[in-house]
């Protein structure tokens, strides 16, 4: 399985949704970086399940056990390994998946890829549960980046077609349900509640902005900043699309409208607009990096759906049991921040080496 990411940071995710523990090993974090464990736990709590009405009923503390790489609160240069114990699993809910794959899940493709040897319980290694160890590394990267003057802020841009209003600002940082318009937020929550009541689910879009990233991060072609961020973000289950800056909207603009005019502000080169999302030619230009990620509705729903019995090759109806989110978007916000932080810090380390 491809569970490793990074050029300077090398992180490997391990475990399954219902295994005794899930975890991560990361190499490449320089020695001497201060890790605030309380701040890290607060970040992980934003992703943790079972804490609100729009989340799965599965309750997990998501308290990380750091086994190596940290001494007296500082990174020591050795590989950092951390685990999170799985304490609230119900594998019996997935007994029927051995022969009947769930629509919208990786059950069928995993069956083909791994000849039936994959762990099916809770989605195994394909589960969104595996975003928790990624958030450990992302949370640490966020702390390091903040000390370098680089901050990340995200919001729920839309849920079930209900779009937030206003501009993304730092005031939303760390909020459980980060939206600008309280009225639109209530509409989103109501849409989630209605989907849950109907045994269904809804998706949405998360917008993320990275402030303070210096010009010069990233490379042309395959090492571009968009490539790095997209690769990390697509590692989050349920992500089906990503766009930077004005995104697909640029296709309807003229060049004179899309081009971000350069100017000088306080002795620094800036652009008057930011249609490019802070990236030109794969390299950051010093403006905020802005992107949006689209999340599909949670595929585990209680409504009856059609599948196929893989033993008899006969179509049959099924309804998914177990505990699942009617909307994954609110809990996915810190996952997007973690992915972006890892990608940006990895590129930041590359730039530091280039400038030596």
Regions found by a protein language model. Name each.
Residues 1-58:
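N-terminal, positively charged regions that mediate nucleic acid binding
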Residues 10, 300-356:
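Internal helix-turn-beta structural module
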Residues 10-15, 118-130, 215-219, 276-279, ...:
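A short glycine/serine-rich beta->alpha loop
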Residues 14, 20, 199-202, 206-315:
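Glycine-rich anion/phosphate-binding loop at the beta-strand->alpha-helix junction
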Residues 20-32, 128-150, 223-231, 287-297, ...:
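Alpha-helical support elements that line or immediately flank enzyme active sites
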Residues 44-103, 107-109:
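Glycine-rich, N-terminal phosphate-binding loop and its surrounding beta-alpha-beta segment
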Residues 98-124, 306-324:
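Short acidic, glycine/tyrosine-flanked loop/strand segments centered on an H-E-D-like triad
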Residues 113-221:
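Glycine-rich, mobile lid/loop segments that gate access to catalytic sites or pores
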């Amino acid at each position: 399985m491809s569970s490793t990411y990074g050029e300077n940071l090398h992180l490997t995710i391990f475990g399954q949704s219902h295994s005794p523990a899930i975890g991560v090993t990361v190499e490449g974090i320089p020695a001497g970086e201060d890790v605030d464990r309380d701040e890290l736990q607060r970040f992980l709590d934003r992703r943790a399940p079972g804490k609100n009405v729009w989340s799965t009923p599965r309750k997990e503390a998501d308290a990380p056990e750091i086994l190596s790489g940290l001494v007296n609160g500082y990174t020591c240069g050795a590989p950092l390994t951390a685990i999170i114990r799985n304490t609230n699993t119900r594998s019996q809910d997935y007994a029927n998946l051995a022969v009947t794959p769930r629509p919208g899940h990786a059950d069928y493709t995993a069956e083909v890829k791994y000849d039936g040897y994959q762990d099916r319980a809770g989605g195994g290694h394909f589960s969104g549960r595996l975003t928790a160890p990624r958030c450990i590394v992302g949370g640490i990267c966020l702390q390091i980046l903040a000390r370098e003057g680089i901050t990340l802020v995200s919001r729920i841009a839309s849920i079930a077609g209900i779009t937030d209003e206003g501009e993304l600002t730092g005031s939303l940082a760390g909020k459980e349900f980060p939206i600008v318009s309280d009225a639109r937020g209530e509409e989103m929550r109501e849409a989630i509640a209605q989907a849950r009541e109907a045994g269904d689910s809804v998706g949405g879009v998360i917008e993320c902005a990275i402030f303070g990233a210096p010009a010069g991060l990233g490379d042309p072609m395959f090492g571009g900043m968009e490539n790095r961020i997209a690769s990390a973000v697509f590692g989050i289950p349920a992500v089906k699309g990503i766009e930077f800056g004005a995104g697909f909207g640029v296709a309807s603009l003229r060049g004179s409208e899309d081009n971000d005019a350069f100017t000088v502000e306080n002795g620094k080169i800036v652009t008057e607009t930011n249609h490019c999302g802070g990236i030109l030619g794969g390299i950051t230009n010093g403006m905020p990096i802005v992107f949006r990620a689209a999340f599909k509705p949670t595929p585990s729903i209680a409504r009856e759906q059609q599948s196929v019995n893989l033993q008899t090759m006969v179509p049959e109806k099924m309804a998914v049991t177990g505990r699942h989110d009617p909307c994954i978007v609110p809990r996915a916000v810190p996952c997007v921040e973690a992915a972006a932080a890892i990608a940006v810090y990895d590129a930041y380390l590359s730039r530091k080496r280039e400038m030596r």
